[in-house]
Amino acid sequence: MGILHPSYAAVVLLLGALACALVVMVISNQERLTLSTRRIRTTATKFLVTQEGYDYNILNPTPVEYVRSAKNGYAMYSVNMWKDPKVLATMEHDEDVWSICAHEDLPNLDVYFKADKKDEGILDQAITIFSLDCRSIDYESYGVTGFIVAMDKFGNVVNALPHGKGAPGGLTLGRSEGISMYNTTTAILAAVHGGFLWDYVTGELEALPFVADTHSLVYRWDDNKYYGMYSDAESRKTHSPQGMGAFDGNTGANKMDDPAYPGWGYLDDSHLNYLTVDGPFAYGSSRGESTLYKIDMRTNQKVWALGGRDSNFTIYGINGQPYDTKLHKYAPERYPWNHQHKFQHLGMGFYSLFDNNVGDGHEQVPKPWGTSSRNVILYVDEASRQAWEVFSHPTGDNAMSYGGTDLLPSGNVLTTSYVDWVHPADPDHQYHVNIWEVSTATNEVEWRAGFKGFNPVAPENLRDPYPHYFFDPLNPDGHVPTLWNIYTADRAYSTVFALHLCSARGGAAVRFSPFNTVRTQNDAPGVAYLLDPQGQVAAQKPFMYQKAWLDRPEEIEVPPGLARFQLGLNNQWDNPWAQDVDMHTLQACA
């Protein structure tokens, strides 16, 4: 895993008055910087500067050796998204995009595959859905462009949806952050101007009958309710949600708009940034308190707190050491995680989070693994009030904002990673933002999508490092992300499927691990069946798909005398899958 980036705040302050590439931009009401005079006045040839022979200056933040890119055993594909007609259509109304965010002749996306993981059948048919937006340092036109992208694992754009003008039906989304899945082909978008449903296959866009905060929005089929944070005036002003609750799936009714509404609502001013639900319980991720709260939606009482000063658990690190949770003052270096994003309930006792590992002033916190942000999966025993880190992966980036850690059917985690500094001449650290797949078994990166951009002050300079944010003293968070960013991402598969087939109980049954097309808030109904050689149903069994793609095996009885058949699966949206099985050659279960 290695030792990772140090904190660079002191370096930034020293360089503030120098006319060099390391510029931290200070914005005030009296002095607004604009890029209108900093147009790219160069040809593609001038952009293609050499990356050889570059030495880091002593004042430049230097990334330590932590190889995550195309070395031995990796294959890389470069993609020019700006040549894709679907992407171009989302940008035609954004006149500043070519001067600030993109160059039409330069590829902006590199996709890496671990060579032995490039042909994995159904796992390679995954679609990644995310919001990619570019932000300038001009506060008067901060959001330059942005779009929702559905992309396959080879970097091909399946579909794209603009944040602004050009969206279907004349709708305007505004910048989107939280993305989750409604069904196999439809994403839920938590955007500035409301909640939306987007079918990435048909391109259809539907506005939901309410406005929620942009951090998080999920849907539960069991009760036809959306769950998210409220978008009241104070929340929008501070970009810090003041509460969370349920929104009626038909009317959008909620307790913030109507206190008499019988649905669930909960007020909290600790900067909530993610919400998951399971049964009668809600799990609220409090960035401000570095905590996950479990709340009984029937009584609105907190059941427990996991992490932070008020933690009810003994928490053990990845090496078995207990963290000191009996803290009487803010001590980020002693917390298990700091200012996390997407702290979520996975089921079966498991939880995951993206540990941004930042303290006061967005400074990275020194920890045993360095100062890097990291992916974390926990196993929690509620009865004994103990929790264990079972997976910890430092990303190699100091991600002061954003991020997630989602389990995948492959056993990998899907994560996004914001960077604080960009190093254009370093193949590993040249990207503004990354989407990763990391193996929970080996801690190795098995897939990566890295998105490139430009220095906002000197876009023709492709050599010198530059900050991926500017400092705004009027902003509560201070450090404001700039240029290309991704808040989080989600995954979808076109069909359900099973992995790890084996012969159980001496050949009397087939054991398999079923996976739904998307992640859901509660376990979702499914059916398994066996088809004989004539295509007739020989056996059938209902079951529930594990909601977060945890590996939970099922078994189905094999009728006596049936040796060759198809194992089939289906879900509530009719996305069937089948595979031939021969009991004579099927490996016995361990």
Task: List PLM regions with ranges.
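A positional/structural detector of protein chain ends, strongest at the extreme C-terminus
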Residues: M1-L4, A590
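Histidine-/acidic-rich catalytic cores in large beta-rich domains
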Residues: N29, S36-A590
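N-terminal signal-anchor transmembrane helix specifying type II single-pass membrane topology
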Residues: I3-R32
